[in-house]
UniProtKB/Swiss-Prot annotation:
Residues in the signal sequence: 1-18
Lipidation (N-palmitoyl cysteine): C19
Principal location class: membrane
GO cellular component assignments: plasma membrane
Name of the featured protein: Uncharacterized lipoprotein GfcD
Compartments it resides in: Cell membrane
Membrane topology: Lipid-anchor
Gene this protein is translated from: gfcD
A family per Pfam: YjbH
Species in which this protein is naturally found: Escherichia coli (strain K12)
Amino acid sequence: MKKNSYLLSCLAIAVSSACHAEVLTYPDPLGSSQSDFGGTGLLQMPNARIAPEGEFSVNYRDNDQYRFYSTSVALFPWLEGTIRYTDVRTRKYSQWEDFSGDQSYKDKSFDFKLRLWEEGYWLPQVAFGKRDIAGTGLFDGEYLVASKQAGPFDFTLGMAWGYAGNAGNITNPFCRVSDKYCHRAESHDAGDISFSDIFRGPASIFGGIEYQTPWNPLRLKLEYDGNNYQNDFAGKLPQASHFNVGAVYRAASWADLNLSYERGNTLMFGFTLRTNFNDLRPALRDTPKPAYQPAPESEGLQYTTVANQLTALKYNAGFDAPEIQLRDKTLYMSGQQYKYRDSREAVDRANRILVNNLPQGVEKISVTQKREHMAMVTTETDVASLRKQLAGTAPGQSEPLQQQRVEAEDLSAFGRGYRIREDRFSYSFNPTLSQSLGGPEDFYMFQLGLMSSARYWFTDHLLLDGGIFTNIYNNYDKFKSSLLPADSTLPRVRTHIRDYVRNDVYLNNLQANYFADLGNGFYGQVYGGYLETMYAGVGSELLYRPLDACWALGVDVNYVKQRDWDNMMRFTDYSTPTGFVTAYWNPPTLNGVLMKLSVGQYLAKDKGATIDVAKRFDSGVAVGVWAAISNVSKDDYGEGGFSKGFYISIPFDLMTIGPNRNRAVVSWTPLTRDGGQMLSRKYQLYPMTAEREVPVGQ
């Protein structure tokens, strides 16, 4: 213990003296790097650093006992989240070879780190973190840690409980408060989120130093490990030293190579791939905006001029089925935006097209954006102000554009104007990739398929929509069973998923939807048919979303029957009502955050609430987590305790060369069970009314 006390004293002196050091000739540090477990840190131990907001990392680390696969994202400057799969190479997935073959054990877990204090001139940065939440608890633990930079050095000192503190090199200070803090449970219910063991059990001091070498790509690490590895799931691991050393080589701005020597006897290597969701920008090859070239004003709308404007509105400004009308001193334009995610870009292009050829006496341009024939918002622009903006003004004489967003104009009373008719029938063919991680038969299961979809508008409100899925290739032949859980008493509302996806061709959905703009911020829809892969039925939804408000409120009510996986045009005997009241909130103090709370009845007839929190970054990429808590007991629910998941929503135009409003969603659900499961509705009013949200930057 004297040796440990001497070491801790040296670390404390180093941190204290570092506070007075100055940056002289050393290059700027490359910034934080990922630890072995994922998330910013040293090697096995964490530090108090958090990557720049929006940074997303994919990590791999490998040694004799473990492989760590992780992703980490800095959601805010003060919050970081990590998802990890751990391959325990010395243990089998299960003792039944017929069930899981010779696959090694896979453990899944979630970590977070919260900054408590930002680094200043004198004081270090301080953070609290928790490892292995909602997992099996193999690496469960928490820590308090401080980091201070001084020149090319970054010093870290902290205290850990649980796995990272198993060495017990210091008495747990909370034991002085109560004896209950002296002991920690040795097992956990898999999938539970519990803080009942926080700051309990053995505790250890850990620390380390990172050194930014004069050669910019290279960063060195030295840490004192708070773990003794005597109770690892992989077995008792020999530890010749508590000191671990490592190096990080930044091969590119988006890639790190890692090499370390740990426990005095083990080599660890790996890599990190990174990007920043705030910095991503589409490499678009788009048509330029129309130049400001005003033509002489005409008397009324001229057919040839309007025809050219309608063509430009469709192909340059991205408005499908554009329509132009002139009433009094206002020129009205409406259409369905299919091209630009940013509504301001669409309105700007439309204004440029219209202002170049205005009839006499027009003082205002009114642009109404629609979705599925429902009017979303009208942007009114003063013509004189617009002309000044486009013509340019002398330095110091510029004026703000006189423009406002108002409730959508109802032009139906005016009759039809000049327009390009909508193609009522449309179809598409889209490749799909379904993925599953951590299954018993294989760590990675996938299915590549083709979704053939078609839509037909009978009227401006009534839509018929259908899709057929065709399998191209999968490795589902490795399935050894349907994996129906034996530890749950709930109706099998989702756990028959393997039986459904074994079909090579099936009708994914075939439904009729009636959409209605009810006015004053109210929108509604009624629908019926084969609504998703596993359910058919009828339902309706009503949404109230005030214009430019940070909140909305919706309700959906459905009655569904389960489709038969052996013949997906037929049904099983199971049916149920399901529906939710959902509140949506964009907190003004948390830029880009959307919170959703849905309360109601799930498919298994359990009742409860689902909370979904998503962070949208500057690029449009959104990262979200969700959890569903219902009135089902843990015993009835089975492994996992409750449903939860993680997703990333990526705008297509970040991956294409042209503007695009579509998105790709990558989702991860650690374990699919039957509790807390919602109907997967293809059309949902809140995302359909996105134009009613205040544009980013306004």
